[in-house]
Amino acid sequence: MHESTNTSDCLIIGGGIMGLTLASLIKELDASIKIDLYEKLHDIGLESSEALNNAGTGHAGYCELNYTPMGKDGKINIQKALEINSKYEISLQYWSYLSSKYKSFDPKKFIKKTPHVSLVFGDQHIDFLKKRYLLLKKHHLFKSIQFSQDKKEISQWASLTMGGRNLHQKVAATIVKDGTDIDFGAASGAILNTLKNKI
């Protein structure tokens, strides 16, 4: 059995957004730490971080209804949405920091402003969405969220979803107009460029 003589302070498995972000954070905190990063595919960011393999919403909790489950008592728990959104805000701050430090790091290449819409039908789902909206609206992270049951307004928010619908069908939607779409594969590549010759 061959014994490797390579030594490193930190071994990271996976060259996606999480592995590269961890490598970046470590190097920013202590540039002397030796990191080895391994990826089984032929390039970084091709599995879960790849644009077509990921929702790309930034997982900000704006439109992910499963982040605000309703309990058996009928109460909606928004805690997960608040936690996820605050973590996403930290990601945005870190990318802003990298952008100020490295000229090659341009968040505009992987972040696009994209409204986040949740659309529901029927009394039960509309009641859930309205309760969710009223709870989230109270928190500063969700202050820009809007709610509507007006079909014309919803058509302006998400026109393709409303065409040809039954005029008598009850519908409701929420929108956060300052949502984002993230290409985590491209973000992985941008972070890797800041790590060139460092790991």
What are these regions (language model features)?
Residues 171-199:
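Helical element adjacent to the flavin cofactor pocket in flavoenzyme catalytic cores
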